[in-house]
Amino acid sequence: MSEAKRLAAEKAIDYVEDGMIVGVGTGSTVAYFIDALGRIGHRIKGAVSSSEQSTARLRQHGVEVLDLNHTGNLSLYVDGADECDPNRCLIKGGGAALTREKIIAEASERFICIVDPSKQVPVLGKFPLPVEVIPMARSLVARQILALTGGQPVWRDGVVTDNGNVVLDVHHLQITDPVGLERSLNQIPGVVCVGLFARRPADVVIVGGEPPQVI
């Protein structure tokens, strides 16, 4: 699937315009996008990064990394996904960067999601749903998620987000109402961010292939 990821990432470069500040996500597919972005780094003003991992890779390519508080809203955000449904709703957060990813998506006029074909699903939920949680609320949130969804929350032991929080991965879900579930989980005290991108889905999904498919 690495070739499909590369093809999707390189197609996303078509959406990058001269003088842009580009929002950049996290993950294996985005790594290919960062590499491609580095080749045209002289054409853009810089990037806003969703993780320390992506920040390091951008800087390796000589791309200036900027603070979202100073840039204001962005024209373009490019990121991957763990799952994508036909309505371009996503599960994200496998790399534990979901909160910063959601912030940048919200701040961006256009959100381009780049995936390989294995990430396309008819209904979200086969991939465990990540939920970022304040550490002291981990058990409370897990109990409430179990009661609300019937899914099985599992603590991602040993993982601390860039924000200093923990992650619960909720298994055995079939998410037929992504917007409703995102809203409900966000109401649980202690939840920082839910890895459902449904209220703000992707605007365009690029599926890697020969040629890439644009949805």
Swiss-Prot record:
UniProt keywords, alphabetically: Isomerase
Swiss-Prot/TrEMBL GO biological process terms: D-ribose metabolic process; pentose-phosphate shunt, non-oxidative branch
Residues where substrate binds: 26-29, 79-82, 92-95, 119
Catalytic activity as recorded in UniProt: aldehydo-D-ribose 5-phosphate = D-ribulose 5-phosphate
UniProt xrefs under Gene3D superfamilies: 3.30.70.260, 3.40.50.1360
CDD domains referenced in this protein's UniProt entry, alphabetically: RPI_A (cd01398)
Enzyme class: isomerase
One of the record's GO molecular function terms: ribose-5-phosphate isomerase activity
Cited NCBIfam families: PRK00702.1, rpiA
Subunit structure comment from the entry: Homodimer.
Family of the protein in this entry: Belongs to the ribose 5-phosphate isomerase family.
Name of this protein: Ribose-5-phosphate isomerase A
Lineage: Bacteria, Pseudomonadati, Pseudomonadota, Gammaproteobacteria, Lysobacterales
